From Swiss-Prot:
<keyword id="KW-0217">Developmental protein</keyword>
<dbReference type="GO" id="GO:0030154">
    <property type="term" value="P:cell differentiation"/>
</dbReference>
<keyword id="KW-0479">Metal-binding</keyword>
<dbReference type="GO" id="GO:0035591">
    <property type="term" value="F:signaling adaptor activity"/>
</dbReference>
<feature type="binding site">
    <location>
        <position position="125"/>
    </location>
    <ligand>
        <name>Zn(2+)</name>
    </ligand>
</feature>
<dbReference type="GO" id="GO:0031397">
    <property type="term" value="P:negative regulation of protein ubiquitination"/>
</dbReference>
<protein>
    <recommendedName>
        <fullName>Protein BEX1</fullName>
    </recommendedName>
</protein>
<dbReference type="GO" id="GO:0005634">
    <property type="term" value="C:nucleus"/>
</dbReference>
<dbReference type="GO" id="GO:0005667">
    <property type="term" value="C:transcription regulator complex"/>
</dbReference>
<feature type="compositionally biased region" description="Basic and acidic residues">
    <location>
        <begin position="115"/>
        <end position="128"/>
    </location>
</feature>
<dbReference type="GO" id="GO:0045944">
    <property type="term" value="P:positive regulation of transcription by RNA polymerase II"/>
</dbReference>
<dbReference type="GO" id="GO:0140678">
    <property type="term" value="F:molecular function inhibitor activity"/>
</dbReference>
<feature type="region of interest" description="Disordered">
    <location>
        <begin position="1"/>
        <end position="37"/>
    </location>
</feature>
<dbReference type="Pfam" id="PF04538">
    <property type="entry name" value="BEX"/>
</dbReference>
<keyword id="KW-0597">Phosphoprotein</keyword>
<dbReference type="GO" id="GO:0046872">
    <property type="term" value="F:metal ion binding"/>
</dbReference>
<dbReference type="GO" id="GO:0007165">
    <property type="term" value="P:signal transduction"/>
</dbReference>
Length: 128
């Protein structure tokens, strides 16, 4: 009985390790999909396909491309958000100034006793 239980435990542990290994291999395959085509062979040597070598440019593999871009330029979404906030803030300020000017001019016109200078209503009156 004990030997059957030991076998069952061993089988379960073997299945678990096999599943873990398969998961690791799948993760490695997914991680390897984004790797560059030209991989370093030795220090400074890169595989160049045969044929017309002048047209084929060997590109150095970029390791941790996204990390490099984020640290060199800053996070693009955050930068765009800051620029948009600055632009929107400036537009709101300009609109508020225009609104204040219009409100002020209307309130001054209503308060002032002088007739409006640009109102030529009398000139175009057709009544005799």
């Amino acid at each position: 009985m004990e030997s059957k239980e030991k076998r069952a435990v061993n089988n379960l542990s073997m299945e678990n390790t096999n599943q873990e290994n398969e998961e690791k291999e799948e993760k490695e395959q997914v991680a390897n999909k984004g790797e560059p085509l030209a991989l370093p062979l030795d220090a400074g040597e890169y595989c160049v396909p045969r044929g017309n070598r002048r047209r084929f440019r060997v590109r150095q593999p970029i390791l941790q491309y996204r990390w490099d871009m984020m640290h060199r330029l800053g996070e693009p979404q955050a930068r765009m958000r800051e620029e948009n906030m600055e632009r929107i803030g400036e537009e709101v300020r300009q609109l508020m100034e225009k609104l204040r000017e219009k409100q002020l001019s209307h309130s001054l016109r209503a308060v002032s006793t002088d007739p409006p200078h640009h109102d030529h209503h009398d000139e175009f009156c057709l009544m005799p």
